[in-house]
Curated annotation (Swiss-Prot):
Keywords: Elongation factor, GTP-binding, Mitochondrion, Nucleotide-binding, Protein biosynthesis, Transit peptide. InterPro entries: EFG_II, EFG_III, EFG_III/V, EFG_IV, EFG_V, EFG_V-like, EFTu-like_2, G_TR_CS. This is Elongation factor G, mitochondrial. It comes from Schizosaccharomyces japonicus (strain yFS275 / FY16936) (Fission yeast). Gene3D superfamilies: 3.30.230.10, 3.30.70.240, Elongation Factor G (Translational Gtpase), domain 3, P-loop containing nucleotide triphosphate hydrolases, Translation factors. It is found in: Mitochondrion. GO terms for biological process: mitochondrial translational elongation. It comes from the Eukaryota. GO terms for cellular component: mitochondrion. Its main location: mitochondrion. One of its GO terms (molecular function) is GTPase activity.
């Protein structure tokens, strides 16, 4: 059995449809079970195909997918069509529509006002995939629509962490853009196969072949078209299916009627044959069966092509490319068919966890209803009924009312309420089995926590969380505002890239995030959701300090003032280290190494030394910014049988580290951003001149017919107010994205200014 949903409110037709889909097999078997008065073996719930007795039939028809792309490529518009064509919503509303309703997946008021996706949103829908024999097969598609702006990249990270496949959307005019490359990197990090949809084929300057070339060259993944457009720009009518060599048109007022004809327009036959041959040639380099047919100069059948595309897509060696225009209601239904045909079901994906009881040994999880529960909390939201925790169930079944264990905290909790999500709407369910995406209410946990039924102690690896690069001091206009701290605590809990701390010296509240827009959104949410207006300081750059050479240390801390004294001696050295990955794939930029032998420093004091080292890294001695890329090696020392203590060794190591740090030729590092600018060709000189003033290094320039795209490396310290500059210099037609790239030594004059300012504050 795959899923048995007991929907608490059976008013709506779609709930009844979903219930029928998941319980058809169950009801038959349950009736038999009652007649026989005995338990039914679980194997009766499984399909009798090639993978009989291994996966439920319904599980093979489940897809968990994400919609990802560069900003303004049409992700949310595409998702709106998917929901409409699958019957999930009754009408289409545009992202910036005149009716002011907004797209279903943009549920936040801010999202609808700004016309951008800020938070990922989850939903599910049913799609009837027509089979070769004319029958229809029902598929369940769980969808997460993600933001395209780099400032909200954590939403993409946590979505891809739990999804099985993805639809990568490209703009037919702009092709592969900066955030496309970022999303590709995230997909590779979590081994997510993808199919590609070239959107906006109705726009002037649309060039799908250029976009496919960029997929091959910039993303370094084999890509080939499985469709070609019928018409272009304003005359776009439909697509030619290169696998079956047939034409597909969207008819009806909103493209809801799909018309398939066996003929191809005469003027497109040559192009169709050319692109089909290229598709076969590309697959021949990946798939053995197609390769043999290619060598024998035999033509593969549509079934062989589809099998090869699925195999190559699942192995992440290939991405099939589809075309259309979501806004013009063209090409969306064929892509839904492709989601069913080429993207994996949960059992096609290998997921692993770490067995805590076996020294964190890697174990493979099984997408099986009967196995012990393993589920991951991947996102938190504060809702009207308490904390809403988004869950991906990898193994077993999550049931309302059952007791489950948070492996990370050790707490045993009861599942009070379980829901399926449709953007900001929810539908109660009794249970969610392996492969499901659902949400729990009223469970206190952190993002990344693993839950089991208590019989096993597995933890799943956490998602990658980038470090914030911009900070801002804030304070409420009304000092008595009770919601200020409450709001910041909530935002931190929901968003791992949003950080809050109190500056120890100025006592100011400092918020940190991924960019100016990221922080602006939270300030607006403070004002709207908590009615707390804030006064902000000047944006701060996340400078860092590091050392450039090795320096030894030897320090004796000795204090006697009556009673028990303090005694501790530490010796060793500090040195520069390159960042390295830990076991979870996260970069570590500091290291404490204990080389003390013979008990010169008793073992109970070593943790105090390590703690002091980490505390020193939090605030550097040049400018007060954190220290990175530093290794401390503790080699020797001395202790007193009476006067030594943890405090004494913490004090000794703190003084020793400061002396060694100042002797190791420390410098200040500044964050360098990868900036991509797209603007009209006529404004190229103005844009380059503006970036030159900001000390940019131009890395690449791609000039199109009407627009050019420029990639540059720019110090973050020089990028403030750039958004208003580019708007004014390009008459509002230019846009840019910015992503953290690396740290480099700051220019000498910048270092001197920062050091002088810090010394002035600490006189």
């Amino acid at each position: 059995m795959f899923m048995r949903l007991k929907v608490l409110e059976m008013n709506s037709i779609r709930r009844q449809t979903l219930l029928r889909q998941f319980t058809n097999v169950y009801n038959v078997v349950s009736r038999s079970a009652r007649l026989c008065s005995q338990a039914i073996p679980k194997r009766l719930f499984y399909s009798t195909g090639s993978r009989a007795n291994s996966i439920p039939d319904a599980l093979s028809r489940l897809r968990n997918i994400g919609i990802s792309a560069h900003i303004d490529s049409g992700k949310t518009t595409f998702t709106e069509r998917v929901l409409f064509y699958t019957g999930r919503i009754k009408d289409i509303h545009e992202v910036r529509g005149k009716d002011n309703v907004g797209a279903k997946m943009d549920s936040m008021e801010l999202e609808r006002e700004k016309g951008i996706t800020i938070q990922s949103a989850a939903t599910y829908c049913n799609w009837k995939r027509k089979q070769k024999d004319g029958d229809e097969q029902d598929y369940i598609i769980n969808i997460i629509d993600t933001p395209g702006h780099i400032d909200f990249t954590i939403e993409v990270e946590r979505a891809l962490r739990v999804l099985d496949g993805a639809v990568l959307i490209l703009c037919a005019v702009s092709g592969v853009q900066s955030q496309t490359i970022t999303v590709d990197r995230q997909m590779r990090r979590y081994n997510v196969p993808r199919i590609t949809f070239i959107n906006k084929m109705d726009r002037m300057g649309a060039n799908p072949w250029r976009a496919i070339e960029q997929l091959n060259a910039k993303l370094r993944i084999a890509a080939a078209a499985v469709q070609i457009p019928i018409g272009s720009e304003d005359n776009l009518e439909g697509v030619v299916d290169l696998i079956h060599m047939q034409s597909i048109y969207n008819r009806g007022k909103k493209g809801e009627k799909v018309e398939i004809t066996g003929s191809i327009p005469e003027h497109l036959k040559e192009l169709a044959n050319e692109k089909r041959a290229l598709l076969i040639e590309t697959l021949a380099n990946i798939d053995e069966e197609i390769g043999e047919l290619y060598v024998m100069e035999e033509t593969p059948s549509p079934e062989q092509l589809m099998s090869a595309i699925r195999s190559a897509t699942l192995s992440r060696q290939f991405t099939p490319v589809f075309m259309g225009s979501a806004l013009a209601n063209i090409g969306v239904q064929p892509l839904l068919d492709a989601v069913c045909d080429y993207l994996p079901n949960p059992s096609d994906v290998t997921n692993t966890a770490l067995d805590v009881n076996q020294g964190e040994k890697s174990v493979t999880l099984h997408t099986d209803y009967n196995e012990p529960l393993v589920a991951l909390a991947f996102k938190l939201e504060d809702g009207r009924f308490g904390q809403l925790t988004y869950m991906r169930v990898y193994q077993g079944v999550l049931k309302r009312g059952n007791q489950i264990t948070n492996v990370n905290s050790g707490k045993r909790i009861k599942v009070p309420r379980l829901v399926l999500l449709h953007s900001d709407e929810m539908e109660d369910v009794e249970e969610a089995p392996a492969g499901s995406i659902c949400a729990m209410f009223g469970v206190d946990c952190a993002s990344g926590d693993t839950f089991t039924d208590g019989s096993i102690k597995y933890v799943m690896s956490s998602m990658y969380v980038p470090e914030p690069v911009v900070s801002l001091s804030i304070k409420p206009k009304n000092k008595d505002s009770p919601n200020f701290s409450k709001a910041l605590a909530r935002f931190q809990r929901e968003d791992p890239t949003f950080r809050v701390h109190i500056d120890k010296e100025s006592n100011e509240t400092i918020i940190s995030g991924m960019g100016e827009l990221h922080l602006e959104i939270y300030l607006e949410r403070l004002a709207r959701e908590y009615r707390t207006e804030c006064i902000t300081g000047k944006p701060r750059v996340a400078f860092r300090e590091t050392i450039t050479t090795k320096a030894p240390f030897s320090y004796l801390h000795k204090k006697q003032s009556g009673g028990a004294g303090q005694y501790a001696k530490v010796e060793g050295y500090i040195e520069y280290m390159e960042p390295k990955e830990d076991g979870n794939g996260r970069l570590v930029d500091h290291e404490f190494v204990n080389h003390v032998v013979g008990g010169a420093i008793p073992s109970q004091y070593i943790p105090a030394c390590e703690k002091a080292f980490k505390e020193c890294l939090e605030r550097g001695f040049l400018t007060g910014h954190p220290i990175k890329n530093c290794r401390l090696v503790l080699e020797d020392g001395a202790a007193h049988s009476v006067d030594s203590s943890e405090l004494a060794f913490r004090v000794a190591l703190t003084h020793a580290f400061r002396q060694a740090f100042m002797a190791a030729k420390p410098i200040v590092l500044e964050p360098i951003m990868n900036v991509t600018v797209t603007a009209p060709v006529d404004d190229q000189g103005v844009v380059i001149g503006n970036l030159d003033k900001r000390k940019a290094t131009i890395v690449n320039t791609d000039i199109g017919e009407e627009e050019f795209t420029l990639q540059a490396e720019v110090p973050l310290n020089s990028m403030f107010s750039y958004s208003s500059d580019i708007r004014s210099s390009t008459q509002g037609k230019g846009e840019f994205t910015m992503e953290f790239l690396k740290y480099l030594p700051a220019p000498g004059y910048v270092q001197k200014e920062l050091i002088a300012e810090y010394e002035k504050q600490h006189k």
